[in-house]
Amino acid sequence: MNRFFNRELSWLAFNTRVLNEAKDESLPLLERLKFLAIYDTNLDEFYMIRVAGLKQLYEHKIASKGIDGASPEEQLEKIKHYLAHEIEERELEFQKIQALLFKKGLCITPYNELNLEQKAKAKTYFKEQLYALVLPFKLDSSHTFPPLANLTFALFARIKDKETQIISYALIKLPSFIFRFVELEKGLFVLAEEIVEAHLEELFLEHEILDCMAFRVTCDADIAITEDEAHDYADLMSKSLRKRNQGEIVRLQTQKGSQELLKTLLASLRSFQTHSYKKHKLTGMHIYKSAIMLNLGDLWELVNHSDFKALKSPNFTPKIHPHFNENDLFKSIEKQDLLLFHPYESFEPVIDLIEQAASDPATLSIKMTLYRVGKHSPIVKALIEAASKIQVSVLVELKARFDEESNLHWAKALERAGALVVYGVFKLKVHAKMLLITKKTDNQLRHFTHLSTGNYNPLSAKVYTDVSFFSAKNEIANDIIKLFHSLLTSSATNSALETLFMAPKQIKPKIIELIQNEMNHQQEGYIILKANALVDSEIIEWLYQASQKGVKIDLIIRGICCLKPQVKGLSENIRVYSIVGKYLEHARIYYFKHENIYFSSADLMPRNLERRVELLIPATNPKIAHKLLHILEIQLKDTLKRYELNSKGRYIKVSNPNDPLNSQDYFEKQALKTF
């Protein structure tokens, strides 16, 4: 018997749970639409990275197998088989929601169903907003198929010259920055590509449009960087980003159009060359023909529309923790260690802390790591302001996938402001989230530390659940000072801390030691691990051994879980759960009954434990330990948004009509009640 679930199929099962939220009829319609958008965006990234990686292994005949022993070719086939039915489910769900939205006055209307007045408005919109932006290409001997960047959205048409009757083909690129949903009248939307298609004869004069189809390509978007050869890491990353759009096509999505047109499109894709003059390899490319609009990720335009509040979930306003109501946040932290649970407790104190430090003459230095900060960052702006007055040192991780460009921009801005900027660490990704502020008061140095499971990003802090920790304890500050020094001197691989634990050297051995300690207590042992993913085979094997010793183990794993629970003789004392709700579960909390409770930036994956700089923080304060355990206990009682994984790999929704509990709603209400 195989002891592990396949990683890729486990991820797909997570995305299925996201799709299930779109099917939840108790949710407002635009909330359901939001989950369809998330589903598609997730799947885009899965193809750009995971499927692209498997395709590379297969094409280069690299003998690499998944944790379950499946070859790249087998995994690609399993992925295609898994998605074949689910893509149809997604389309049906969109059509159901679309029909319900129509009844509520939000109409996504096909162009051919518009009346004459509405078509006249569409024509005006085409002339004023689209005509100058679309890129039409007639494909002939002097105009070959142009390069297609990752996530290119385009139309492919068969056209006939009215004079010569010669049939040829045309490509019309639609830029990503145009509005996809064009509101012709209040509540009446038409897709931009349908407006363009209806006016193709204005782009190809003296031609008749015979057939047309919309299509979208997904390409390999992983960035390969040879760090050994890097003299200027920022410059190397900048050049690598420019190559991202030149990756091989891994997926083709098409909408309507004849089979003949699809065959011609495929032949055209096979013949064209990229900027690097390497032909695209379409071997094993996944092709999906859609009955609905392509790229449901663009549904965010409707979800965020200001006119349909009645169709959305009410906005929750994060509450300010009462200990942070004082004007001087540093005094609050000196009084006691504090732990916030975002988004229920506001992220604002984190921003305020940096802003207060920047304006306080007593502040000597600010040290910080930045992983994903977003395009508009008040935190970076505060650091830029501080850099003109005090010592500011920032490690900006340029290898944060899909945030590389934003991080590079902020790193350059910080450098221009006078901050010391470090661009990551050689062969390691810095994923630890930490802030250290040093002040001088009463002729003494005082250190203030903030550590978090989530990013320094106010926007994600409103939709991700994370915990963040504030402390003025010297033993914690000393470890963070040591860690920052190791990052600046590129010695993080071999560094070890005293109070905290860091990867790649300490976290995995510590977690194994904690599991072994619970094994010593056999049936009295109890472990709860809450993480985004559980993939590390060594940790899974130790959990199996603990189960066989009688230790009760509850795992709350939001996404990928390669461990097989409830298998007789192997894991019958292990139960695996997953919570998917309106907030993305992101906090990592690790509880060991006979030792302590910890929170961490690290998931239980080889990449986090062996190839990243991460932190594991023990909750030595009883109040904080109790708060963390309470989070776990409530989530284990969730009967509305919790799934249980069975031994066959299926996720079954937990239900108890007599005791309905949505853990995320519970924490919202608790925040309102407490504050």
Curated annotation (Swiss-Prot):
The keyword Thylakoid does not apply. Catalyzes the reversible transfer of the terminal phosphate of ATP to form a long-chain polyphosphate (polyP). It comes from the Bacteria. InterPro entries: PP_kinase, PP_kinase_C_1, PP_kinase_middle, PP_kinase_middle_dom_sf, PPK_C_dom2, PPK_N_dom, PPK_N_dom_sf. An intermediate of this reaction is the autophosphorylated ppk in which a phosphate is covalently linked to a histidine residue through a N-P bond. Its cofactor is Mg(2+). GO terms for molecular function: ATP binding; metal ion binding; polyphosphate kinase activity. The lineage of its organism: Bacteria, Pseudomonadati, Campylobacterota, Epsilonproteobacteria, Campylobacterales. Mg(2+) binds at residues 372, 401. Belongs to the polyphosphate kinase 1 (PPK1) family. One of its GO terms (biological process) is polyphosphate biosynthetic process. Transmembrane segments: none annotated. Its EC number is 2.7.4.1. The active site is at 431 (phosphohistidine intermediate). ATP binds at residues 42, 464, 558, 586. Pfam families: PP_kinase, PP_kinase_C, PP_kinase_C_1, PP_kinase_N. This is Polyphosphate kinase. Disulfide bonds: none annotated. Keywords: ATP-binding, Kinase, Magnesium, Metal-binding, Nucleotide-binding, Phosphoprotein, Transferase. It catalyses: [phosphate](n) + ATP = [phosphate](n+1) + ADP. GO terms for cellular component: membrane; polyphosphate kinase complex.
